[in-house]
Amino acid sequence: INAIGHRVLHGGTKFTKSIVVNEDVKAAIRECFDLGPLHNPANLMGIEACEKVCPGKPNVAVFDTTFGMGMDEKSYLYAIPHEYHEKYGIRRYGFHGTSHSFVSKEAIKFGGLDPENAKVIVCHIGNGASVSASIGGKCVDTSMGLTPLEGLIMGTRSGDIDPAVVQYICNKENKSVDEVLNILNKKSGLLGMSGGLSSDCRDITAAAEEGHHLAKVTLDAYTYRIAKYVGSYAAAMNGVDAIAFTAGVGENDIEIREELCEKYWGYLGVKIDKEANHT
């Protein structure tokens, strides 16, 4: 072992690129615990475990938020009092950055596109899911926000939701904000919308094919949300040269890819090669 790489969820505004870990870096990761409470503590534990097991070997932190740091202010700022951004760094960061960065560049190579100007949309669709838009490999926009809760319908995450829903559920169910956020993170998405059927897209698809009403509605909403994001990003970039799929569902679900391409994106000039799609 020459070196050890660590995917760290949230770098806040502190990190704009990968970095060799030292005590200052670990302290900064700790300072981002409140931004990534589900992931950053575990990420730091992994780093410290590797330091003990492999003393003297360099550890490199690769931040999920780095790709989204390339967005312009019009994309990353929320329409809330600006003081909250200045005081607390509240903004849209985006996640799955290592995936979006790599896949967008690979799509450019595969398609023989102009590496400086190619407009690429990447659909990272797995249990966690996000869509990104980039021009020449630089992030223009991405669907996740301050946390990975924003954006697409995911396995157990709600994705986009009216913020007032949180207070409404708190009042109706006598729950704390933390309890409701836990529901939105761990009990919503495909799992919640299907009535607790499953967080796995394969199970939802199978149930929908058997006539399960909520499963069908959930699957329709799932693809519809993806289609909307891709459409909005094509508009934001004034066109798109390539749409790439990755992650568990994106890579392996033939039907989801086919439905998105045929049902929603014909106006973009998308034509799916069914033989290649089944390969």
For each of these PLM feature ranges, what is it?
Residues 1-39, 58-60, 66-75:
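Short beta-strand-loop/turn "lid" adjacent to the catalytic site in phosphate-handling enzymes
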Residues 67-172:
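Glycine-rich phosphate-binding loop of actin/hexokinase-like ATP-binding domains
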Residues 102-110, 217-238:
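Phosphate/ATP-binding catalytic cores across multiple sugar-kinase/actin-like superfamilies
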Residues 117-123, 178-187, 242-244:
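Beta-strand segments within the central parallel beta-sheet cores of soluble alpha/beta enzyme folds
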Residues 173-218:
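A mobile "lid/hinge" subdomain adjacent to the ATP/sugar-phosphate binding pocket shared
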Residues 241-263:
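Glycine-rich phosphate-binding loops at beta-strand->alpha-helix junctions
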Residues 266-279:
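Short mixed-charge
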